[in-house]
Each structure stands twice: as structure tokens, then as C-alpha cells.
Amino acid sequence: MTRHNLRLFISAIFLSSLLSVTASADQLLQSIQADYKQRLGDLFIDFHRNPELSTAEVRTAKKLTAELRSNGFEVSEGIGGTGIVALMENGPGPLVMLRADMDGLPLKEKSGLPYASTATQLDPITGKVFPVMHACGHDVHITSLAGTAKQMAERRDKWSGTLMLIGQPAEERIMGARAMMRDNLWQRFGTPDYALAFHVSAGLRAGLINVQEG
């Protein structure tokens, strides 16, 4: 499985647990592939080329916010710093949360990719300037969240409940989730009945999904 197809497949993971069993997996995959060619591929490249350090994900949050709003989500910004919370209410049912982390790492990219990051940024935590890259796959995560938003919005007849999409800051520093909780995340937006997160992994064979409860 190529990296391109792996990203598409991972995007489908978010959807598979929420869509009705009547939805065709083949149709869903075709829809995701079409969206990747038309929009998500360029969005991924943009996120990869423009990474931001923990607590400084300003541009990333703005771009993800615009994507989610364009698909009909009500988005609140500045939650726990640069965090965002997007809600779509769709009748009675559970509140389901999907989370994607947004921050890059203070590393210089040497991939040789035509869209490799050349970014540098002042780290608000240390006060030092670092090269920045998406070395942990968060560019894949937020692109997949944007793709999930579109697929779920277009399939509202296939599910019922409330969908909460979260763009989490500062995951790499183990700070962002706590910051959002201190900002009264559950009290303001509701406590999820189910919460889902995913992460790409270089330690797993391509095409393999490892599911853990926690």
C-alpha cells in the first residue's frame, strides 16, 4: 500500500465507526479518493509545508477552522490556547468526539520532498528559534479530520447524534489536552459518549490497523 493510499485508508477509519452499515465501503473509498484528488492532497501539502510548534499553531488552527466551517460545522476557536472545537448536531443520539493533534516538531526536514518544510519559528516555550517539520504525522491527522468533516456532513442521512471534532494543540509537549480541559472543554461543549483518536505509525506494517481501548 502506498503512502497516498494509506492516508486515504486512515481517513476512512474515522468514518467507519460512525456511518450506517448501509453505506457502501467502496462508495465511501471512492468519495475519499475523489476528495483527495480535488482538495485533500493540496491541503496535506500545505499543512506539511507550514508546520508550527506546540502552542503556536495559529495558522494551522485558522486553516483547519475554515475547512470545518465550510462543511457546516459550528467552530469555536482559542480553546486552551490555539485549540478548536467543531460541532455538528444531527438529531438525537450520542455525542461522538474525534480528535486530531496539530503541532509540529523542532526538527529540520531532510526528506528531499518537493513540499518539504523549510519553516523556522520562535518557540514560545523556550524563546529560541527552531526549524520545524511535521515529523510525527500530525499533518496527516488534521487532513484526515478535514476529510472526515466533509464525508460526515454529506452523509447526515446515515447517522444521528452530535459530532465533535477537535483540533488539539501542543500534543508533542503533553500540554494541549490539559489546557483544553482547564478551559472547561466538557462543561462548554458537552462530555462525549465516545471519543476516537488515531495516529499513523512507522512501527506497523502498511495497511495494518491496531485498535486499542483507552
Question: How would you describe each model-predicted region?
Answer:
Residues 9-20:
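Bacterial N-terminal signal peptides
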